[in-house]
């Protein structure tokens, strides 16, 4: 796995590596798996929790940009350890347009290297690191952002997609 920390202004494009296999429940109904997305580009943006200020901002920004992702032929999915019940309330409250995947056991989050120790007010706990992955139509991760700062992030993902798909 190519794990890197992406800071503002750095190149998120990585040496391609295989997206881990997954099969997760989707807020849109049914399950979404790596196999079901074969032949399609997709973006997975991982965030710590529904209904928290920064995660809400990030989800709303990705949702507003969904038509731009669709115009590029790219599927967009939010991913957190929240269950489908939490996702349904979150989607309804903010009018989110993209599906959210529920990784309650953090299997994919961990496989992507985005589950780890965090600290809040001196208290240590395990949680999801905000990160984003661009997966191509062959199932390879072509770009990744780690420890994401939300300001300007959606635009950076779209810019990278334009470059990769050119």
Predicted regions and their residues:
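Chalcogenol-based redox active-site neighborhoods
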Residues: 1-166
């Amino acid at each position: 796995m190519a794990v890197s920390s992406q800071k503002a202004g750095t190149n998120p494009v990585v040496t391609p590596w295989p997206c881990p296999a997954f099969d997760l429940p989707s807020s849109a109904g049914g399950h979404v798996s790596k196999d079901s997305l074969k032949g399609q580009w997709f973006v997975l943006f991982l965030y710590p929790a529904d209904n928290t200020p920064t995660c809400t901002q990030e989800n709303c920004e990705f949702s507003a940009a969904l038509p731009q992702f669709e115009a590029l032929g790219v599927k967009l999915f939010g991913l957190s350890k929240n269950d489908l019940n939490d996702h349904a309330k979150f989607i309804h409250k903010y009018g989110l347009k993209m599906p959210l995947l529920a990784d309650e056991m953090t299997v994919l989050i961990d496989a992507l290297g985005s589950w780890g120790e965090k600290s809040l007010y001196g208290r240590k706990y395990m949680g999801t690191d905000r990160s984003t992955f661009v997966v191509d139509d062959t199932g390879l991760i072509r770009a990744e952002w780690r420890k994401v700062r939300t300001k300007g992030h959606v635009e950076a993902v779209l810019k990278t997609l334009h470059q990769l798909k050119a």
